[in-house]
UniProtKB/Swiss-Prot annotation:
Residues modified as Phosphothreonine: T1398
Compositional bias segments (type: Low complexity): 590-601
Source species of the chain: Canis lupus familiaris (Dog)
Keyword Disulfide bond: no
Name of this protein: Breast cancer type 1 susceptibility protein homolog
Amino acid sequence: MDLSADRVEEVQNVLNAMQKILECPICLELIKEPVSTKCDHIFCKFCMLKLLNQRKGPSQCPLCKNDITKRSLQESTRFSQLVEELLKIIHAFELDTGLQFADSYNFSKKENNSPEHLKEEVSIIQSMGYRNRAKRLRQSEPENPTLETSLSVQLSNLGIVRSLRTKQQIQPQNKSVYIELGSDSSEDTVNKASSCSVGDDELEITSQGARAEASLNPAKKAACEFSGDITNIEHHQSSNKDLTTTEKHATKKHPEKYQGISVSNLHVEPCGTNTHASSLQHENSSLLLTKHRMNVEKAEICNNSKQPGLARSQQSRWAESKETCNDRQIPSTEKKVVVNADLLCGRKELNKQKPPHSDSPRDSQDVPWITLNSSIRKVNEWFSRSDEILTSDDSHDRGSELNTEVGGAVEVPNEVGEYSGSSEKIDLMASDPQDAFICESERVHTKPVGGNIEDKIFGKTYRRKASLPKVSHTTEVLTIGACAIEPQTMQTHPFMNKAEHKRRTTSSLHPEDFIKKVELGIVPKTPEKLIEGINQIKRDGHVINITNNGPENETEGDYVQKEKNANPTESLEKESAFRTKTEPMSSRISNMELELNSSSSKAPKKNRLRRKSSARHTCALEFVVNRNLNPPDHSELQIESCSSSEEMKKQHLDQVPVRHNKTLQLMQDKEPAGRAKKSSKPGEQINKRLASHAFPELTLTNVSGFFANYSSSSKPQECINPGLRREEIEESRRMTQVSDSTRDPKELVLSGGRGLQTERSVESTSISLVLDTDYGTQDSISLLEADTLRKAKTVSNQQANLCATIENPKEPIHGCSKDTRNDTEGFVVPLTCKDNHTQETSIEMEESELDTQCLRNMFKVSKRQSFALFSYPRDPEEDCVTVCPRSGAFGKQGPKVTLECGQKEESQGKKESEIRHVQAVHTNAGFSAVSQKAKKPGDFAKCSIKGVSRLCLSSQFKGKETELLIANYHGISQNPYHIPPLSPIRSCVKTLCQENLSEEKFEQHSMSPERAVGNERVIQSTVSTISQNNIRECASKEVGSSSVNEVVSSTNEVGSSVNEVGSSGENIQAELGRNRGPKLNAMLRLGLMQPEVCKQSLSLSNCKHPEMKWQGQSEGAVLSVSADFSPCLISDNPEQPMGSSRSSQVCSETPDDLLNGDKIKGKVSFAESDIKEKSAVFSKSVQSGEFSRSPSPSDHTRLAQGYQRGTKKLESSEENMSSEEEELPCFQHLIFGKVTNMPSQSTSHNAVAAEGLSNKTEENLDSLKNSLSDISNQVPSAKASQEHHLSEEARCSGSLFSSQCSALEDLTVNTNTQDPFSMFDPTSKQVRHQSENLDVLNDKELVSDDDDEREPGLEEDSPQEEQSVDSDLGEVASGYESETSLSEDCSRLSSQSDILTTQQRDTMQDNLIKLQQEMAELEAVLEQHESQPSNSSPSLIADSCSPEDLLNPEQNASERVLTSEKSSDSPISQNPESLSTDKFQVFLDSSTSKNGEPGMIRSSPSQSRLLDTRWYVHSCPRSLQDTNCPSQKELTKVVSMEEQQPTESEARDLMEQSYLSRPDLEGAPYLESGISLFSDDPESDPSSHRASELAHVSSMPTSTSALKLPQFQVEESAKSTAAVHIASTAGYNKSEDSVGIEKPEVISSTRGVNKRISMVASGLTPKEFMLVHKFARKHHISLTNLISEETTHVIMKTDAEFVCERTLKYFLGIAGGKWVVSYFWVTQSIKERKILDEHDFEVRGDVVNGRNHQGPKRARESQDRESQDRKIFRGLEICCYGPFTNMPTDQLEWMVHLCGASVVKEPSLFTLSKGTHPVVVVQPDAWTEDSGFHAIGQMCEAPVVTREWVLDSVALYQCQELDTYLIPQIPRTAADSSQPCV
C-alpha cells in the first residue's frame, strides 16, 4: 500500500508539476483559455483582458514588463490542448485512484487553484450546462457509476470517520455528491430539465406551501433541500456565530456537520464561497434528493436556474471546490444521508451523524483549508472593515440572505468577523425555516457576492466557467437572474422566488454592484429586505404572488399558484395598479413592512450597516458622478437587457431608500414584533417623513402611481414578451416588487422607511421604468415583439399620457390624482434614487474620473442607444427609457417636479395631471432642468442629494408655473397622448414654456396637438417647437441658461462644451448630464435640436410675446425651457423620425416642419439628420476638443448643442441669479455684458457663445440693430421677431453646431444664421479672419466666436425680433465689426480656450491652419466659380443689398473656403448638410423675417445670407456634396421646405446643393448664385436647372414647401444612407465617398479626396488608434472599425520599412484595392498639418510573404484601372468550405470575390462551365475531424487547397500556384484518386 501510495504520490506530484507549468502566472489557475503575448508568455485570456482593461494605455506583461495590447494577444490552441489533456489525465487519475487530485487545492485555492479549478471546472461546466454540454452528457453517464464508485472509494479513503457517513450515504450519496459537482449533477439538471420544470412547479408550489409551512415543515419535496439548507444554515449559524467556535462547536454539537459543513462553509464564506458551498451542498443534496424526488428536479432547476448563477456558484465552487471536494464527500454524503432520511429531521440527524465522521477527515483535511479560509476570512473582514464596499456587498448579499435569513446566516460569516451582531442575524435566519429556502436562493446571490469578495481580496477571480467577467457576469446575472431566476424560482419554491426577487434585486444590484460594489451592497440590502418583506408578503399570499409574478411568468407552475394569489393583485396592478393594488398592497406593504421590521429587528445591525453604507454613500454620492458611472454601465446593461439596466436603477434607488431605511429600520426596529400594518404605518410615516424631508411638497403618493403603472406595464410586457420576459420579468419583478411596494404607495411610503425607500428606490427605478416602461416597455416590447410593442406602446402611451395617471389609462383623472399622490411619493423616491446615485457616484469615483469615464461610457452607450433608439420605432422609446434611466436621478427629480406640478395640477384636473405626469416623465429630462434651474448652475452641480431636494422644492414652486404650462399645454399633453412618449414629455416641458410664454403659444401648442393628430410627431415637434420656441425665447432671455444647463446636464457632452465655455457650474451640469446618460443626452440633444427647430417655426407667430413674457417670467421660462428641452429630447427619442428632426434641429432649430417631415418620413430621414447631427457634433468635438467624446458623434452633436444650451442655461440661471455670473465669470460676464441687455432668450441660445461674443454681440447688436431698422421696415415685426426667434433658435442650434462642428461649422452656422442674422456672415468673416490671424486660438475662438456671434445674434434677435432681420443685414454690414468683436471674443474665447484642452487647441489650430491653406485653394476655386455665383448673386443682390450680397459672397467665398476646408478637414462637411440645412432653415427663417412677406424681395441680408449660405453650403456642402451630395440636396430641400417662401433663396441654395429641391428652385437668381457657387459641384453644375427649382421653391407656398420638405425628407431618406453616412462622417463614408467621388474636384484644393476618405486601422495600440482618430476628426475623415466597400484607407502598424503583420483588414484592403498605408502616414500628416501623399507610406510587404512584395500597390493599381482582367482570381470559382479561424467565412469569401473570383457556397454548386476553374479552400487545422476535408475534392472534382493559398495570393496580389497548397484527397475509387490532384 505504501508503495502504491508512493506511486500515486509520484504521479500526483508529476501532475502537480505539470499543472503548475500550465497555470496562469496571474491567477494561478489552470489556463483554460490561454493567450500568448508577443513575449511568448501565456496567460489566461480573462486575466489578460482584465489586466488590459485596467489601464487605458498599453499594459505590461506581468513577467517581462513588455508592453501588451489586446491586438498582440494570440490564442494558443496548443497550450489549450495541453491543458485539456492534463485535465483528462487528472480526471483519469482521480477515477483510477479514487483520490481527488485537487484535495490539497481544495484547501489552498491559491496554491493549486488551477488543477482544482480544472477539475471543478469540469464538474462546474457540466453542472453549468454551458460548456462541453455534450461532453458532460457523454461523460456523466458513463462516469457516474465510476465517479460514484470512485467517490465511495474516495470517500472511504479520504474520510476515516467519513467511512461511517459514507456507509450511510455512500451508496446514494457518494455518487450523487461527486456527480452533482461533477458532470452528473449538471447533466442531471440538463437531462432533467423537463422533469425539473415539472418539479419546479411542484416544488415551487411546495415551496409556496412551504413558505407558509417552512417553519413547520418545509415541504417534504423541498424538505430535503430545506433541511439541507437548514442544517447548513445551522452550520452557518454556528459558524456565523463564531467561525472558530463554530468549528469547535460543530465538532461538539455536530462535529461532522459543523466541521464538515460549517467549517467548510465558514472557510468558504470568507472567500465568498461559503454560501456557494452551502448552496452547492444544498443543491447537491437537493439534487440527490431530487433524483429520488421532485426535489432533485428542483435542485436541478436550481442548478439550471443557478447555472447562470452557477457561473457564480461555480466560481464560488471553484473557491469552494477545495472545500467542495470535501463538501462533496462530506456535505454531499450528509445530503445523501438526508436523502435517505428524506426528512429534515432525518437529514438533520444524518447531518448530525455526519459531523462526527466529517470531523476527523474534515479536520485532517481542513487544517490547511481552515487556515486558508481563516486568512481569507480575515482578509474579507479587513476588506469589509476597511471598505464598506465589501460590507455593502456582503451586506447586499447578506441583505438577500437576511431575506433568506439562511443565506444571511451563510453569508454572515463573512461579516461575522466584521460584525458581532451578524451571528444574531444568522441565528435568527437559521432559526427561520424559510431561511433554508432563502438560503438557497441567497446562495445564488451570495455566490456572486463570494466571487465579488474573492475578487476584492485577490483582485481577480478568473472564473471563465462563471461564463462572464464580473461586468458581463453582472449583466448575465441580471439576465440570468431573470432566466435563471425562473428555474430558481421553481427550484427555490417560494423561497426561490423570493430569492429570485432577491437575486433580481441582487442581479439588478449586481451591475451596479459590479460598478459600485458598496452601493450595490447597500442597494441589495434594502431591496432584499424589501424582497424579504415582499417574500414574506408573498408568504402572506397576494404580495408573494405579485412579487413572484415576474418569476411566475418564468416559473409557470409557481406562477400559476402565485398568480392565483397574485392574479387579483396583479390584475389590479395591471389594471388600476394604484387603486386595486393599493388595498392589496396595503396588506402586502404592511406584510412587507412587517417583514422589513422583522428583518430589521432580526438583522438590525445589518440594516444599520446598510444604513451606514447608504448614509455614507448618500453623503458621498454626487448625483453627477453617479449618473456618469451608472448610465454607461446601465446603458450597456440596458442594451443587453432593459431589465438589467432598470435593475441597476432600482439598485441605485434601493440604495437611496437604504438611507431612508435607516430611519425606517429604526422605526421598524422599534416595532420588530409588530410586523402588522401598524409597523407599516410607522414605516409609512417615516417614509413620509423621509419623503417630505426630501420633497416636502412631493408627498410620497405620486411615485406609487408611476410604480404601479410601471409595474403593470412591465407585467404586460412580461406576458407579451416571452423573450424579453426574463429580463422584463426581472424588471416586472422588480417592478412588481415596486408595484407591490407601490401598489399601496402610501402604505409603502408608510410601510417602512426602509421598505418604502427600498420600494421607493424600486419605485424610483419604477419611475425610471415608468418612463422606461412607458417608453422602455415599448422599447423592450418592441425589441421583443411587435405585439408586445404595441401593447407596451399602449401602456407606455397611456403611462406617458397619464404618467401620473399611468396607473389606469382608463382613469386619467383618478389616476392623475392618485398618481399625483403616488407621484409625489415616487418623486421622493426618485429624489432618493438621485441622491443615491449621487452618493454612489461620489463614492465610486471623483467627478473628473466619473466625468471622463461616464462620458465615454455614456457616449458609447448613447451612441448605441441613440442609434438603436432611432433605428427602431421602439428605439425612440428606448431612448425615452434611457432617458428615464439617465434621468434616473433626474427622472426621479423629474418625478418630483411632476409630483409637485402634478399635485398642483391635481387641482387643475386630470388634464394637467396627465400633462404633469407627462412632465413627470419629461421631468426626468425636464426636471433636471427644473432642478438645475432651481439649483442654478452652481446648484445644479449640487444636483446630487441636496440639489435634488432643493430642485424638488424649487420644482414644486416652479411646479406651479409648470402646472400653468401644463394647463396651457393640456392640448399638447393630449397630443402627446397621440405621441404619448414624445409629445407628453415634450408637451410637459413645453407646457412649462408655454405657461411662461403665454397662452398664445399654448394656442399654438393646441394647434400643434391638432396637427399632432394628423401628424403626431410633427405636432409634437410643433408643440415642442412652439413651447420650445417660446421657452427658448424666454429661455434665451432668462431661462435659456437654465434650459441650456439642463440640456447640459442632460447631455453628457455638455460637460465638455461647458469645459470649453470654462464654466465649472456648467461642467458640473455636464457631468450631471453625463450622469443622466447618453440616451437622455441624446434625447435632450434631440429635444434641444428639435425644440429649437420647433421653436423657430412656432416662434414666428409667438416669438415676440413669448420673449416678453419670458422676460417677465424668467424663472418660469427657465423651468419651461428646462422641461422643454427635455421633452423635446424625449419626444425626439420616442419619435424615431425625431432623429432626422434632430439633425434638422441640430442643423437649424428652425425647421419645425422639417422635423415634422422628418418624423413623418422618415425614420431614414431621422437617421440621416441624426447622423448629420452627429457629424456636426463630431466636427465640433474636433474643434472644441471633444475628441474624447467623439466616440459618439451624435452624442457630440447633441452634447455640443445641449452643452451650448447648457451653457446658456447656466447663463440664464446666471441672469436669473446674478451671483451665477460670478461663478461663471468668463461666460457670464461676456454673456451678461451683452446677453443681459439681450433677452435671456439670446442668453440661453447664445450663452455658450455669448461669453466670447458679448462684446461682439454688442457690436453686432449695434450693427444688427441698424440693419434691423432697415429690415424691420420690410418685414413685419411679428414675422421678423418670429423668424428672428427661429433664426435665433437656428443660431442656437447653429451655435451649438458651430461649437460642436468647430470653426467651420460655426461658419456654416453663422452663414446660415446670418440668413436671420447677417452676424453669421461676419462671423464667417471673423472666422476666416481669425483663421488667418489667430492660428492657434482661432479655431477654438472661431468656434466659440461663431457660437458667440450666433448667440449674440440670437440675443440681439431676442430683444430685437425685428432687428433680427436687420441684424442680419447689419451683421453683414458690420461683418468686420463682428470680426473685431470676434477678435474681442477671441480674446475672451482665449480665456475660454484656456478651458479647452490642449488637445482641442492643437486640433483647432491644426484645423485652422489647414483651413487657411485650403481656404486659399478654395478661394481660388471659388473665384473661378464666383463669376457664376456673382451673376446669379447680382440678381439676388438686386433684390436685396447687392453690396452686402457681394460682400457676403466674398465672405461666403472665403467662408465657404474655410467651410470647405473645415468640412474636408472635419466632419463638418458631413455636418454641413445638417448645418447647412439648419443654416438654410435659419436662412429661410431669416429670409422670412427679412421678407416678412413672401412677396417681399428677400432682403439683402437674407440674400446675402443665402449667398453666404450658398457659399458656405457650397463650401461645406461641397464637401458635403463631395461626401454626400444627396444629403446636401436633401438638406437644401429640407431647408427650403421649412423656410419655404421666406427661404426661397435659401431653398434655392439648398436646391442648388441638391436636386431634391428642384421643385423648390424657383428663385432662379438665388439658384444661379447658389448654383454658381455649387457649380463646382456636379450637382450644382445644373445651375439653371437648380435655379428654376429654387425659383419654384421660393414661389412654393409654405405648405408646398412643407410638402416638399417631406419629399425632400423622403429623398433625403432615400439618400439617407449617404446623408446618414455623411452625418456620421466618422463612421460612414460610403455615401460621402459615393457622393464625394462625384465632387472631389470641387474641393480639390482642399483635397476633395478627404471627403471620400474612410479609414480603418489594424494592429494599432489604443494610443495609436486615438491618434488616428484625432487625425480623422481633424480632417473629417471617416474612421470605422470594420472595413467596407466605402473604406479607402487601411492604416497598418508597420516598422520603419513599412512591413506589417498580416491581418484580416490587411487582406481585405489589398483585395479591395484600398490604400494600405503605414501608421506613419498619419503621424507624419499630423506633423505636417496636412494629409500627405499616401504613395510614400504605402505598405511594402508583410512578415510572412516578404518585406517588399508590393502587393498592396499592385492591388490598388489594378483596382484603379478597374480592369477585371487584372483580378488575380478571375475565372475561378472558389468555395470556402468548412470552418476557418481568425476570420469569418463570409469575410474570406468577400476577399476572394474582391479578387475577381466567383464565390460558391457549397462544393456541389460548382458550375464547372468552360472558362471557370473550381477551387475548394479549406483550413485543415480548423477541422475537428482530420478526415473531414480529405474527401471534399472527390465530391466536387475540384482541387482542395489550404487557406494559405488565398492569403498568400491576396497579400502578393498574385495568384499562386495550387500545387504547393493542395491537400491530398482520399480517393473514393481508383478513378477518383487522381481528382485530388486536379
